[in-house]
């Protein structure tokens, strides 16, 4: 078929008088020319310089004859011509950190196959020539943009089959400008100068002057003792030791134990406090506590019309004393205070309503909201009626045994004792300056002597004593009571009278104890007393 030649390659070698055999694979020189056209640039300015350098190299390289009108054509082989549009752009690559990053890519390639005369150079070697347009850039194009040149080689059917087999082994990550892969997220792009900072907002951040003066760092330390050696010049105060120069988290002293908000004692919190009170009856909760009050959410106040309490426990009772400075009924304002124009809610922070009127969910559900207004002021009669109701309630609690016991608070009792002791010292010389106190023994002796004097003055005749050994007649007792008191009692002060009456009551209370011990021999004593007082009658009578 080929005129005695075995293959078409041998026929072509004899036809073109070429000693070298035709090869399907790409020649090493062609591969070198292809790789030499890949440009690397760190920034746009460097890319422009390299573009001019490449133009000089292309002029000195081997050239292939082409038509004068085809300025933007690249001859790849004897029968292949590829035309590139002027709007195409080149991929810019950064070789600084061996990381390739694509800036822009807009490719519009139009392939046109044209035949040429067979009087060309060798078919096995592909000649390549770069011709660039040296004209000024069009207004549509931006200055300093690097174009992308993609070189495509079209060969025969056998060569196409070989290239397709080679392309099957090429993966997506090997191609420049391909789609993003999930494995590429681990690559760190350390490029400086390639991107513009035009998209960032021009925001000026600054540090407050107070933070600078206090010299407080925003970086938290990993351990507690890292900042142990602090400087005293810092304007901060520790809440643990009350010393300046460091914070409580860096304090070398042990942390204080939190105090209870109910009894102000340390060692327990609110939920474990022994003085914890019941939310329904407001009494301390003990082990045997029994609450007979209605549940708090079923109570409604007749005074402020709020849920959670009764009228006697309404917070308006103490709120009405906002103008009172003297003891007595609360003072009323001359003109009623109107509602302010600016109204905000403490629960939802919205404008237009108060916190007790808010319908949103409460931040703290343990208490019920109360009204901040005062609807009425109490008078003397209202205060007296409320005190009577409270006393009646206390009596009922004492009867049932539900009255709260007093909890011992050592630090409070010590302060109270000191205050009372100081008050006694200060008041004793003024109160008892004229009438100093006497001992109990001297007081008892005086009372006995006075009782003896009154008994002698009201002494009955001997006959009456005989007839009435256990006591005198009622008339005699009446005479004794009608006697005038001694002069000393008239001259005594009112204070001495009260003191004497009190001592007499104490002596009367102590006498029955002695009588109980002598009840057994009372009859014998009376018989002996009667015989002793009995005297022999005169015989003449």
From Swiss-Prot:
Q: Where is this cross-link: Glycyl lysine isopeptide (Lys-Gly) (interchain with G-Cter in SUMO2)?
A: 129, 136, 138, 234, 249, 334, 408, 431, 473, 484, 487, 530
Main location class: nucleus
Where are the annotated CCHC-type zinc-finger regions? 236-253, 258-275, 299-316, 343-360
- Whether Signal counts among this entry's keywords is no
A single MF term (Gene Ontology): zinc ion binding
* Location in the cell: Nucleus, Nucleolus
Entry protein name? Zinc finger CCHC domain-containing protein 7
Transmembrane spans: none
Gene Ontology terms: cellular component: cytosol; nucleolus
Q: Where is this region: Disordered?
A: 111-144, 394-541
Which UniProt keyword terms apply here? Isopeptide bond, Metal-binding, Nucleus, Phosphoprotein, Repeat, Ubl conjugation, Zinc, Zinc-finger
Q: Which residues fall in a compositionally biased region of kind Basic residues?
A: 418-434, 487-497, 530-541
Q: Where is the composition biased (Basic and acidic residues)?
A: 435-452, 498-509, 517-527
Question: What Gene3D superfamilies has UniProt attached to this entry?
Answer: Zinc finger, CCHC-type
**Per its UniProt record, what SMART domains does this chain match?**
ZnF_C2HC
Q: Which residues carry this modification: Phosphoserine?
A: 477
Q: How does it assemble?
A: Component of a nucleolar TRAMP-like complex, an ATP-dependent exosome regulatory complex consisting of a helicase (MTREX), an oligadenylate polymerase (TENT4B or TENT4A), and a substrate specific RNA-binding factor (ZCCHC7 or ZCCHC8). Several TRAMP-like complexes exist with specific compositions and are associated with nuclear, or nucleolar RNA exosomes.
| Phosphoprotein is among the record's keywords | yes
What spans are recorded as compositionally biased (Polar residues)? 116-126, 474-486
